C-alpha cells in the first residue's frame, strides 16, 4: 500500500515510488528529467527482469487461486453456505489487488518514477489502501463469524442468512473505504527545501503523522488484535469442552454448555437435521467445526467424525452424494423421523450411541451403550488429535497474517514518528504484504475437503460437467 523512499523534506516519504535521486518533493508533479534526457532506471536490466518475473508470478498466482475460490463457491452445492460469501468477497478484493494495484506498483518500482498521470495517481493510491485494507478486515470478519457460530451455536446459525452475511460484507467495505479516502480529502502538495518541483513525477500518499498512525491502527493493528483475541477465545472454549472425556459428562452438563442444544427447535434443527443429541455429540461436532479454516462448511453426514459439524443443517445439507446413496438414505431417514414423531412433548429425547454421527442416525439401546466404552475412548483420542490439528490451523491463520503484514505496518508507523528505516528493507516488507493476497486461497481452502474436491472438478476437464 505504501512505499518509502530516501528521506524527504519536512519528514515526508514517498509511499509508492522507488528510490529517487531527488528527495525534496512530497507531491505529484510532471516535470521532465533534467536536460530533457532519458530517465535513469533505478535497477540494472537483470534485476529489473527478475523483479518483473517475480511480481508477474505473484499476480498470476493471486488471480488464479482466488478465481478458483469464487468458481468453487458458486458451482459446488457443498460450498453454498451463506458464510462462504465471505470467501467470495475476500477473493474479489485480492483479485482487485493483483489487477489494479500490483501492476502499477511494479511499474513505479522498476521505472523509478510515476508515469500514469496525476488523476490516476490519486485513484491508484485510494484503491491500493482500499483493497488491501478490505482484505485484512475480511479476515477479521470471518473470525468473528466463526466465534459467534461457536459461542451462540444454533441461535446464530439460524440467523446466518445470505442477507445478514451480505450486510456484514458491505460493512467491511464501508470500513475499508473510510480508512482509504481521507488521503484524497487531505491530499497536500509539498515542495522541497528549495521550493522547486522535483525532477521526476512522483505519486505519494498522505504522509501526515495523524493519518499514518490512524490508518495503521485501522488497517492492521485493530483487526489483528481482534483476530488474535477471538481465536484465543475459540481455542479456550474448545480446550475446555474436550478436556473431560464424554464418559464423565452427564446429559445435563453437555446440554448446558451450548445454548439451545437440549431441546428440539420448531424449525427442525434437532437430531434429524444434523443437530446433535444431548450426550456429548454436540461438543464433538463443535470441536470438528473448529478444526476447519474460518468460514468452511463441513461435508454432510459422512461416517468420519472429522466431518461432523454443528453447521451441517445450514451449510452442507446439499453436499454431493452418489446417486445411489440418496435412495439408500430414504429408508433410515424416514424411520428416524417416524421415531422422532412418536416422542411426546413432555418426553426426553432418546440417547444416542457413540456411533451416531450423521443425519437420521439410529438410537442406541442399553446393550449398545454398555459395549460402547471402546468407541468412546477412541472418539476421545480422536478429539485430542483434532485439538492438535486445530492448534496448527490457528497457527497458520494467525501466523501467516501477522508475518505478511506486521513488518510493513510496524516500519510504516516508525517512519511517522521519525525513526529511520532502510529503504530497501521497507520495500521488501511492502511487497511481502502483497503476498498475503495470494496465500489466502491456500490458507482457507487447503484444510477443506469440499474445496479440494471442487478444485479437482474445476481443473479436470472430464469432470467439469459433473460439478454440482
Curated annotation (Swiss-Prot):
Cytoplasmic side: 75-85, 145-164, 233-392, 449-468
InterPro entries assigned to the protein according to its UniProt record, in alphabetical order: ADR_fam, ADRA2A_rcpt, GPCR_Rhodpsn, GPCR_Rhodpsn_7TM
Biased amino acid composition, Low complexity: 351-366
Disulfide bridge partners, by residue number: 121-203
Pfam family, one: 7tm_1
Region (Disordered): 242-279, 291-381
Residue positions, PTM Phosphoserine: 348
Purpose of the protein: Alpha-2 adrenergic receptors mediate the catecholamine-induced inhibition of adenylate cyclase through the action of G proteins. Component of the ATAC complex, a complex with histone acetyltransferase activity on histones H3 and H4.
Name of the protein in its database record: Alpha-2A adrenergic receptor
Organism: Bos taurus
Amino acid at each position: 500500500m505504501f512505499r518509502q523512499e530516501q528521506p524527504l523534506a519536512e519528514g515526508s516519504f514517498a509511499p509508492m515510488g522507488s528510490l529517487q535521486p531527488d528527495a525534496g518533493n512530497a507531491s505529484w508533479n510532471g516535470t521532465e528529467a533534467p536536460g530533457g534526457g532519458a530517465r535513469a532506471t533505478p535497477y540494472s536490466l537483470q534485476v529489473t527482469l527478475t523483479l518483473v518475473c517475480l511480481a508477474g508470478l505473484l499476480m498470476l498466482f493471486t488471480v488464479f487461486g482466488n478465481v478458483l475460490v469464487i468458481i468453487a463457491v458458486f458451482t459446488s452445492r457443498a460450498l453454498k453456505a451463506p458464510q462462504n460469501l465471505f470467501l467470495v468477497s475476500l477473493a474479489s478484493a485480492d483479485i482487485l489487488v493483483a489487477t489494479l494495484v500490483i501492476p502499477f506498483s511494479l511499474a513505479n518500482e522498476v521505472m523509478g518514477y510515476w508515469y500514469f498521470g496525476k488523476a490516476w495517481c490519486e485513484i491508484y493510491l485510494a484503491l491500493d489502501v482500499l483493497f488491501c485494507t478490505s482484505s485484512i478486515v475480511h479476515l477479521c470478519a470471518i473470525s468473528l463469524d466463526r466465534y459467534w457460530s461457536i459461542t451462540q451455536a444454533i441461535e446464530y446459525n439460524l440467523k446466518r442468512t445470505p442477507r445478514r452475511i451480505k450486510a456484514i460484507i458491505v460493512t467491511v467495505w464501508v470500513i475499508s473505504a473510510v480508512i482509504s479516502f481521507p488521503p484524497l480529502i487531505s491530499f497536500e502538495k509539498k515542495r522541497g527545501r528549495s521550493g522547486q518541483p522535483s525532477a521526476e513525477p512522483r505519486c505519494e500518499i498522505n504522509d501526515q503523522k495523524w493519518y499514518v498512525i490512524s490508518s495503521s491502527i485501522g488497517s492492521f493493528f485493530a483487526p489483528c488484535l481482534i483476530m488474535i483475541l477471538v481465536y484465543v477465545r475459540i481455542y479456550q472454549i474448545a480446550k475446555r469442552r474436550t478436556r473431560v472425556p464424554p464418559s464423565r459428562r452427564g446429559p445435563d452438563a453437555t446440554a448446558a454448555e451450548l445454548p439451545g442444544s437440549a431441546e428440539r427447535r420448531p424449525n427442525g434443527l434437532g437430531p434429524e437435521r444434523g443437530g446433535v443429541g444431548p450426550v456429548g455429540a454436540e461438543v464433538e461436532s463443535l470441536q470438528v467445526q473448529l478444526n476447519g479454516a474460518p468460514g468452511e462448511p463441513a461435508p454432510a453426514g459422512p461416517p468420519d467424525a472429522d466431518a461432523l459439524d454443528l453447521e451441517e443443517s445450514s451449510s452442507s445439507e446439499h453436499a454431493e452424494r452418489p446417486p445411489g446413496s440418496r435412495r439408500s438414505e430414504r429408508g433410515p431417514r424416514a424411520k428416524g423421523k417416524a421415531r422422532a414423531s412418536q416422542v411426546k412433548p413432555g418426553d426426553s429425547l432418546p440417547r444416542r450411541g457413540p456411533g451416531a454421527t450423521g443425519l437420521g442416525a439410529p438410537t442406541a439401546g442399553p446393550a449398545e451403550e454398555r459395549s460402547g466404552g471402546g468407541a468412546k475412548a477412541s472418539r476421545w483420542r480422536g478429539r485430542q488429535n483434532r485439538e492438535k490439528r486445530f492448534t496448527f490451523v490457528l497457527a497458520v491463520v494467525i501466523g501467516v497474517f501477522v508475518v505478511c503484514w506486521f513488518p510493513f505496518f510496524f516500519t510504516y508507523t516508525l517512519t511517522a514518528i521519525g525513526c529511520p528505516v532502510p529503504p530497501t528493507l521497507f520495500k521488501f516488507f511492502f511487497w511481502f504484504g502483497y503476498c498475503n493476497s495470494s496465500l489466502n486461497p491456500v490458507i482457507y481452502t487447503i484444510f477443506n475437503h469440499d474445496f479440494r474436491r471442487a478444485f479437482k472438478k474445476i481443473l479436470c476437464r472430464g469432470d467439469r460437467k459433473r460439478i454440482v
